[in-house]
Amino acid sequence: MFLKTFSRLALTFNLVLLTTLVSCTHVHAEKPTYYIYLAGPEVFLPNAVESGKSKQARIQALNQQNDWPFTLVGLYPLDNSIEDFGHNFDTGIRIYEANIELMDKAHTVAANMVRFRGPSMDVGTAFEMGYMNAANKPVFAYYEAKPFYGKDETPGLFADRVREHYPVSKDDPYIDADGQSIENFEMSDNLMMIGAMQTGNGDVALTFDDVILQIADYYLSK
């Protein structure tokens, strides 16, 4: 009788131990998820929602193609649901607060530094890059112009882009028409933005896919 009871207890213990080991193995086998805040002036496009969904789908496709030991997920500002939306100050503040929450959730940022309403990048995107940098999160960027201007562009040098899209002095190519100096440090945009990117890859990627691959390489190196 004692032996039967002991055998049952031993069997029960082994089953519990096996279940625990399987459970622990499953937990450790789960891939970590890294959230990417998708910053850029795409939110102003006529197809703003679709643009974000397309980028999120590309990230999902790259996950499947590369089978990384982690999963990358895009967080897009228009994922937020803003109740009682109106073109007023209160709505603007609530959008800002919702975007801050998304950035706090994100591990990194992929920012489109395309020229926007002038030779330089979108100011909201610039703030978001700075916010993520201040939070000690890696900053990555790319330059994608076709959705905005119907053609591909490369970022080039900021000083050259200013001369192309803003009036400059006839006497000095590094002075604008208002007599103000044009930043000239062999960078594609303002030095504070390029400086913030040194926490990530440091280079402005030429496509969205490229910037996601840069982010993947960053986490693979950890």
Task: State where each predicted segment sits.
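Bacterial N-terminal signal peptides that target proteins for export
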Residues: M1-F13
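Bacterial N-terminal signal peptides
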Residues: A10-V22
